[in-house]
């Protein structure tokens, strides 16, 4: 193990109990009911640490922190840590001393939550170890790893809907030109129910209903506006024309001193 590897703490539980377990006579699993659960051999603190790929279950005194026993775990689940068959709060661990001696002891937690955290801490550590091994293999042989194929398979098609894009392009077209008004100003529409204002013509002439009106002096000095009648047609200008043709007179005007028309 390299000297540069540091030790990290994975889990700490303030109370754990240690039990002596009887030798297993058969290959069946351990049963916590066969232990003397009311008489634990030792009680203290449990701490799980990791250094490199190996996890360590350490049983320490809860006051002084003195190490009571230690169980190295290089694989989980495995022979280093086993669960009992009749409870989720008890486990069998394999402890080792510095001289190479090994022994199996039973540990138990008073709370099921502590037992769950103990189990999950070991699972997460060895899941991380497995990922590190896979990354190392891929780094050594990058060509052997799975390649991501983004190409189209034979006969495979893709459909793209660009209806929204066309709508956006039409909305973002050339802006509509506004009609220019005289003087750079535009006339506002009249308010609802109001009357349109009339344009003021030059002095001496006025418009009324679309026809030109000339001022006519009337009584009292007031100016009255009368529509200028259109001249009659030339064919009907002289109503006495048929009578004057017989006498050869070109005029239909009355003679001076008489009120009769000459026939």
From Swiss-Prot:
Name of one Pfam family that matches: DUF1681
Short motif WXXF motif 1, span: 218-221
Keyword Lipid biosynthesis in record: no
Modified sites of kind Phosphoserine: 181
Predominant cellular place of this UniProt entry's protein: membrane
UniProt subcellular location: Cytoplasmic vesicle, Clathrin-coated vesicle membrane; Cell membrane
Tissue spec: Expressed in brain, heart, kidney, liver and lung (at protein level).
Residue span of region Disordered: 167-191, 209-263
GO BP terms, alphabetized: endocytosis; protein transport; vesicle-mediated transport
Residue ranges of the motif WXXF motif 2: 238-241
Alphabetical list of CDD domains matching this protein: PHear_NECAP
Keywords: Cell membrane, Cytoplasmic vesicle, Endocytosis, Membrane, Phosphoprotein, Protein transport, Repeat, Transport
Disulfide-bond pairs as recorded: none
UniProt cross-references to Gene3D superfamilies, sorted A to Z: Pleckstrin-homology domain (PH domain)/Phosphotyrosine-binding domain (PTB)
Biased composition (Low complexity): 246-263
InterPro entries named among the record's database cross-references: NECAP_PHear (IPR012466), PH-like_dom_sf (IPR011993)
Cellular component, GO annotation: clathrin vesicle coat; clathrin-coated pit; plasma membrane
Function: Involved in endocytosis.
Subunit structure: Interacts with AP1G1 and AP2A1 components of the adapter protein complexes AP-1 and AP-2. Interacts with the GAE domain proteins GGA1, GGA2 and GGA3.
Comment text on domains: The WXXF motifs mediate binding of accessory proteins to the ear-domain of AP-1, GGAs and AP-2 through hydrophobic interactions. Selective binding to the GAE domains of AP-1 or to the alpha-ear domain of AP-2 is tuned by the acidic context surrounding the motif and the properties of the second residue of the motif itself.
Entry similarity comment: Belongs to the NECAP family.
Protein name as annotated: Adaptin ear-binding coat-associated protein 2
